[in-house]
């Protein structure tokens, strides 16, 4: 399972990287097109579950979400048209980048 967050408010990602088991809050300018993800503070109950079960915590820039929003809106072949805002598109943007970006090759390694 992957948790994808806006890089401007990536509290869960920073908490995972810190490896202390505690939540790290993000403050300051939380400006992002992913408005629904711009809170900067995690929930302790959720964090207690996520920190032990998530495979990847991803800090995602706005372009990743914008690209996925366009992919959803312009499906290929028989794929369905999906209407999604930027907060809902970011997981697809992360997956697309992991599969197609040479710099993200390490994300494809199997455990």
Q: Model-found features: residue ranges?
A:
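PLP-dependent amino-acid enzyme catalytic core
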Residues: 1-111
């Amino acid at each position: 399972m992957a948790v994808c967050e806006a890089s401007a408010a990536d509290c869960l990602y920073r908490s995972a990287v810190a490896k202390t088991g505690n939540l790290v809050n993000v403050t300051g300018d939380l400006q992002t097109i992913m408005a629904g993800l711009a809170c900067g503070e995690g929930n302790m109950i959720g964090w207690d579950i996520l920190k032990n079960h998530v495979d990847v915590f991803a800090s995602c820039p706005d372009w990743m979400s914008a690209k996925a929003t366009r992919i959803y809106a312009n499906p290929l072949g028989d794929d369905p048209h999906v209407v999604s805002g930027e907060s809902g598109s970011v997981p697809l943007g992360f997956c697309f980048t992991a599969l197609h970006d040479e710099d993200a090759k390490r994300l494809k390694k199997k455990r």
